[in-house]
């Protein structure tokens, strides 16, 4: 991603942000290739932010046909059926993003992520999955980890007014300012599979309840063959049954996961634009840090709950069991 120097046009366009994070960081951004799959409200906010930041290219994957339902919280889809009729979500969002910053190459890739081989992911520096199944997240993360080069991997999921971000930067080196000098730092990230397989009992009780609740919902959707968000209040009994099974298997009290939180997650299928903006903005910030190699990255989960307006970072790894 080091590549050549910024062009005169790039320097002029990105002048303000260059003053914030420096020309070298901007140069890395303009050479970064990012794959984004699953474009709903939060991911739309993320895409807007990274396109405005001036990444090299963004490849979008979302074969859903654009319709009134897809319009929910996704400002990249114009509320005009004459514009979006017959087009996929990725195609419509691609057109909108090109208007934000013509210097960023925005393209569309069709197909199913879970059917793509390792070689496909090699062309990217960052992979972001929005609203994918647990199986898809595991599959893509595994493919990224098999590559010779390091590909930063992220997932994001917003339900009701709650949001989750997962980060896997593998073995990551970066610099940060300490006192008056820049110091070299290194972090080791667990894979998605490793992070969600950590036994619950050793995890501190103060850990965000959303971490556990999201795992319950993932297991429910997978075991019932549901797509992301295909649940309602009618499913609450089954969700609570799975919660009980997981708590017993992990030797923790069922109070670890409040029933009311699970109810919110399965009934709140509509995204909240303010939450989309917050979580999508944080995700964009983390990707920019990872690409530029400057600043402490998020390790490895982030949770936001619009009910109390609090965001927390949780480091979930096998360090709890060692």
UniProtKB/Swiss-Prot annotation:
Pfam families: ThiF. Pathway: Protein modification; protein sumoylation. The lineage of its organism: Eukaryota, Viridiplantae, Streptophyta, Embryophyta, Tracheophyta. The gene is SAE1A. The keyword Acetylation applies. Disruption phenotype: No visible phenotype. The modification N-acetylmethionine is found at residue 1. GO terms for cellular component: nucleus. The keyword Nucleus applies. This is SUMO-activating enzyme subunit 1A. Disulfide bonds: none annotated. InterPro entries: ThiF/MoeB/HesA, ThiF_NAD_FAD-bd, Ubiquitin-activating_enz. Gene3D superfamilies: NAD(P)-binding Rossmann-like Domain.
């Amino acid at each position: 991603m080091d590549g050549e120097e910024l062009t005169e046009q790039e320097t002029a366009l990105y002048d303000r942000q260059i003053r914030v994070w420096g020309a070298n960081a901007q140069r890395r951004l303009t050479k970064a290739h990012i794959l984004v799959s699953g474009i709903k409200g939060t991911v739309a906010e993320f895409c807007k932010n990274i396109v405005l930041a001036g990444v090299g290219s963004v490849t979008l994957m979302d074969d859903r046909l654009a319709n009134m339902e897809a319009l929910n919280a996704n400002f990249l889809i114009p509320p005009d059926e004459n514009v979006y009729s017959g087009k996929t979500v990725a195609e419509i969002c691609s057109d909108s993003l090109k208007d934000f910053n013509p210097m960023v190459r925005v393209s569309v890739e069709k197909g199913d992520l879970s059917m793509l081989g390792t070689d496909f992911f090699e062309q990217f520096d960052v992979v972001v999955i929005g609203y994918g199944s647990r199986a898809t997240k595991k599959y893509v993360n595994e493919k990224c980890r098999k590559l010779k080069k390091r590909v930063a991997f992220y997932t994001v999921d917003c339900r009701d007014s709650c949001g989750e971000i997962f980060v896997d930067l593998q073995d990551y080196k970066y610099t940060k300012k300490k006192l008056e000098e820049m110091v070299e730092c290194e972090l080791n990230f667990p894979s998605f599979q490793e992070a969600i397989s950590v036994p619950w009992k050793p995890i501190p009780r103060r850990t965000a309840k959303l971490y556990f609740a999201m795992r319950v919902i993932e297991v429910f959707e997978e075991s019932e063959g549901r797509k992301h968000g295909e649940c309602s209040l009618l499913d609450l009994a089954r969700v609570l049954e799975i919660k009980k099974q997981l708590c017993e298997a992990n030797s923790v009290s069922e109070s670890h996961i409040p029933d009311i939180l699970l109810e919110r997650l399965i009934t709140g299928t509509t995204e909240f634009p303010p939450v989309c903006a917050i979580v999508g903005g944080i995700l964009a910030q983390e990707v920019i840090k990872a690409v530029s190699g400057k600043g402490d990255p998020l390790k490895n989960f982030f949770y936001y709950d619009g009910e109390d307006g609090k965001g927390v970072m949780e480091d979930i790894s096998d360090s709890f069991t060692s």
